[in-house]
């Protein structure tokens, strides 16, 4: 019996040691940079640039309202280990930034990408983001031009921390820039098929202000109040009048912000209610080709073009190839 007990102990000890030294695939032995990110579009762009040369771990679970997200205490461990922390900024993730500042390593930078690329003079304050609140619309990544600028910031940050892979990061940036530019050109082409006067967006949550400004669309309203509560009856009545006056063919909700109110507006006005737009919840599942910034925006743009009476021919032609080096962690 004593021999059997010793053998069992030896097996357990061997397994424990093996677990502690499982090779380069274990997190503890992985010498690559650890990059913490917040919302999934930023996680995806960072992963596209980092490839297999850095570990990318997201913080905000997909399908979560990023404006009201409060990080769980265990996120502090990730932030304390991170070599780089990438956030959108523009007041989107203040609780996460506070947690990062209190737990990060002294030499780890918190990079507010949106704040870097957007001059204060270009801040957009609108329906869900009134100027008196001091929080500009933070949704830059829905404009392919700004997404390219995000990628450039990430490329530069990774290259500074990991100079031996500068050429690799630059090559990945060029590939991303090419994809985002092709997407932009496809939108510009397909929107020409939308009937005159129909390039108007009425949404629940206003995530497309910068996109609309860049492409000549008009955001005529966003139903969600600044405090993310339900809109008042008078606001709904005013919106119904506006939809009728503007002859809006489709109003857009989102999977993250399902809205019974928008359904009611649709019924009252005869406009179609499309509830499947995604603000920062990537389509598909992690590992799927469409589970990416490119997949997200292709889906949203073709949904909007089709909903407004156009034909998304060029958008449908965009191929989304698998990112073979995708290894980012997307909380679900």
Predicted regions mapped to residue ranges:
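Hydrophobic core
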Residues: 13-17
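Extracytoplasmic metal-acquisition and chelation regions
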Residues: 5, 9, 19-332
